[in-house]
Amino acid sequence: MTATVSHAGPQVVILTGVSGSGKSTALRALEDAGFYCVDNLPIVFLEKLLELSGHTAGEVSRMALVVDAREGRFLVEAPRVIRELRQKGADVEVLFLDASDEALVRRYSETRRRHPLAGEGGTVPDGIAAERLALADVRGIADEVIDTTTLNVHELKRLVTRRFVAGDGAKLGVTLVSFGFRFGIPTHADLVLDVRFLPNPFFVPELKPHPGTDPRVAEFVLGQADAKAFLERLVDLLGFLLPRYRNEGKSYLTIAIGCTGGKHRSVALAAALAERLEGSGQPVRLWHRDVEKE
């Protein structure tokens, strides 16, 4: 397994599915896990939201939004928008929640709510049928479909949390973010590390134009004795911390590694740390926040 590097922005989870299937419960689970959550944002505005998140000092590394029948005429645009974002390198996953018609009718009966697509004088089964038809194309591009017919609220929350936060469900989900202090410290970071003590490739003419992902820059940074010592001590520290965080019920950890501009030193160190952690079996997400900024 290799680290996920996304210059396009944060991890995005799109929650969709039929009304009454548990989307609100799933969204609350992700919000509790640290996701920035948006309910009922027209899908056509998603790219703009991701663009804006990349121009603030407090970007989030995880975002979730609900796309459902309330989208109205925008709903037909959802498959196209999602495909285009993926083609541009965005980390977008689609989770579709479903349930049997009988379970949905029962849930509507218990809450005494009208189905949003039932129409004037229509029945809940009529609304369910209309909604399934409207969501067919979105369901077709889903990365995963979860049937919530037999799940209670707590079981669904645990399932969603394990799916999107804790990786394989047994290990702490770790996100590594490289950044530049010039652009602000990531506000959602649990641990912040400053690597500005290392020699800066910015002052080496042949290295200055290239990011820390370039092998020449990485070799320059990681070849320093202090960088090697720092990395070894950091791996040891995390080997001590991660299982203890997990035992305390923490399901995710965001580690931010910063240098001056977020282009060279922090990028090389974050990538090296991700490789070391994944080599030990620890799931890692890697995001170079500022590598393309000037």
Curated annotation (Swiss-Prot):
GO terms for molecular function: ATP binding; ATP hydrolysis activity; GTP binding. GTP binds at D68, A69, R70, E71. Keywords: ATP-binding, GTP-binding, Nucleotide-binding. It holds the Pfam family RapZ-like_N. Coiled coil: none annotated. The keyword GTP-binding applies. ATP binds at G17, V18, S19, G20, S21, G22, K23, S24. InterPro entries: AAA+_ATPase (IPR003593), P-loop_NTPase (IPR027417), RapZ-like (IPR005337), RapZ-like_N (IPR053930), RapZ_C (IPR053931). SMART domains: AAA. Displays ATPase and GTPase activities. Belongs to the RapZ-like family. This is Nucleotide-binding protein Adeh_0147. It comes from Anaeromyxobacter dehalogenans (strain 2CP-C).
